[in-house]
Amino acid sequence: MVREEVAGSTQTLQWKCVESRVDSKRLYYGRFILSPLRKGQADTVGIALRRALLGEIEGACITRAKFGSVPHEYSTIAGIEESVQEILLNLKEIVLRSNLYGVRDASICVKGPRYITAQDIILPPSVEIVDTAQPIANLTEPIDFCIDLQIKRDRGYQTELRKNYQDGSYPIDAVSMPVRNVNYSIFSCGNGNEKHEILFLEIWTNGSLTPKEALYEASRNLIDLFLPFLHAEEEGASFEENKNRFTPPLFTFQKRLTNLKKNKKGIPLNCIFIDQLELTSRTYNCLKRANIHTLLDLLSKTEEDLLRIDSFRMEDRKHIWDTLEKHLPIDLLKNKLSF
């Protein structure tokens, strides 16, 4: 973090991308500014965004590889220049772009002699390879070479215990971190009581998403994290009355709707996020993949729209309907929902 003094003017808080470039297929760069901020706010925002960008962004990667008749990962295979361990390390470096959740299968099946690159991976739908030229192995003899792969979307760095699996599969330490690096710097502007700060944020990604997309996802994650604190359970309740009382999940979808109906106010559907609906993780992930983030997004969809979502089932549709029917006013359902 760098702090400098510059001349500047005050204005409405806004952000802007001031630089964007593609250094290579696996290295994107973006530079953003947020201003004007009061003294101390730039540090608060910078630290939170940096942590969210490095630790909360999800990515897809290869997590397991299965070879035929290989006793251990340090083995060598006749006709292949690399050892099994080197092939696993090369597979670990493959950068994938995908919005799918859960485990997906992929494979490689080629005949030598030839070089094997990421382009040779047979992928499931909706999964793309960022750099098809990434090397995997070199077949030096006319042999058949086949690997079964598993792809998983996750976040952070996941390590697995090294052990020999009877089926010939080996785990690959998953690096689900699309953001490679984040820096931020703070510049002070103005004089005296009119002093403000400008936050500069630099983001480098691996090409599976752009810095702007990463910034959006990190911001969304922070909003979801702090959302419960925006709604008090009982306004005006004293600390003495509540200090020894524990109330489990206060900010559920049901309670928000109850309070809204009690106050006889219109329901702000765009302010109720789907993670408050207490859906199953499967249903929630299906909706998120379809960019359905709020109750307004959900109620804007028809049954046909939902059933077109990848992996969305009739059971998911029924679960959503039961939840909404139980907690939403029936007239709102009739007006908004076309199930």
UniProtKB/Swiss-Prot annotation:
GO CC annotations on file:
chloroplast; DNA-directed RNA polymerase complex; mitochondrion
Q: Where is this region: Alpha N-terminal domain (alpha-NTD)?
A: 1-233
UniProt GO BP: DNA-templated transcription
CDD domains, per the entry: RNAP_alpha_NTD
Q: Where in the cell is it found?
A: Plastid, Chloroplast
Keywords, ordered alphabetically: Chloroplast, DNA-directed RNA polymerase, Nucleotidyltransferase, Plastid, Transcription, Transferase
What is the reaction catalyzed?
Answer: RNA(n) + a ribonucleoside 5'-triphosphate = RNA(n+1) + diphosphate
Q: Which HAMAP family match?
A: RNApol_bact_RpoA
NCBIfam families cross-referenced by the UniProt entry = rpoA (TIGR02027)
Job of this protein: DNA-dependent RNA polymerase catalyzes the transcription of DNA into RNA using the four ribonucleoside triphosphates as substrates.
Q: Share the domain note from the entry.
A: The N-terminal domain is essential for RNAP assembly and basal transcription, whereas the C-terminal domain is involved in interaction with transcriptional regulators and with upstream promoter elements.
Which protein, by its recorded name, is this?
Answer: DNA-directed RNA polymerase subunit alpha
